[in-house]
Structure formats: C-alpha cells, structure tokens
Amino acid sequence: RAIKKITNTKTRINYSGRTDAGVHALSQVFDFDTEIQREEENWIKGINANLPKTIAVRKVFNVPDDFDSRFSAVERRYSYVIYNSKNKPLFFDTFSYWVTNNLEINIIKNQLNMFLGHHDFSSFRSSSCNSKNPNKNISYVDVKTIDSFIIITIAANAFLQNMVRIMVGTIIDIAKNE
C-alpha cells in the first residue's frame, strides 16, 4: 500500500522470501516495476512515510528488467538470537529466545557444522510446509557469543518453513546436556 500511495498505481511487489511468525527481517529485498522517476532519497522518504513504525526501507536502486527478488537471490542469511541466562531478558524478549539452562557453545558449534552442505531437511520443516524440494544447501554457519547472547547465523540457498527454528531448537536440546 505504501508504494501504491506514492505512485497512485496498483503495483505488484515481489519479495525475496517470507519470514516465519515472530521473525524479524533485516535486509529483506523486494522489487516492483514503475515508470515513475524519483531520486533515491525521495523514494525512501515517500515509502517510509506510509509504512508502519516497525518497517523501514533503507535503500532503493534500479535493477535490470529480468531481476526477481525471490529467484535472483543466491543466498539467504538467518540469525537466531538466544538469550542464555537465568535472568529474564528485559529489553530483548521479542528479539531473542530465552534459555535458562547453561548451553555448551562447543556442542552448538559441532552440531551446527553437521548441517553444512547439501542435505534433505525434511525433518526440519513445519508440517504445513508446501515446498516441493526439501533439499537445501547450507553454505555458512557461525556461532558468536556476546555477554549472555548466543547468535547463530546460517546461510543457505533457501530455507524451508520453520527450518532454522527447528534446527536451532534441536541443537539447544542437545547443548543443554540433558
């Protein structure tokens, strides 16, 4: 609706992908066709003025006509933030998953590395996932700790519905040493 408001035309928007419920997107890419010419700054101001406070456009640029946000993307990156503390998170509760058990970082790293490469991830998707191909290629994994936060980053050609959430949940169960 934000683009329709500033272009006064019905505009089809292509997104690079969906996010699962409760997931926050950084650098989500989308594209649309328009004949309207504006400076980048004016596009950004106009779109942002018509978006909710929780969404912001940071960059705008022209792309070739055959560009498609979803199918031109070669990689998607997902960071999962765990707050690992006995104390309740005060400011980051909507941006992290709270785990009170002490998690073994080396176990997390070892388990995460097992996902690298091309695999069938059927066991790591939602029962409502409609993807015809459960085979995905994970090209990068990383684990960082900052104070009580554990940040797990995974890059792949694509993800299945709830794939990272289920993978990380499984790794957390293993890392609890229960």
Model-derived features: positions:
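Structured-RNA-binding interfaces characteristic of tRNA pseudouridine synthases
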Residues: 2-178
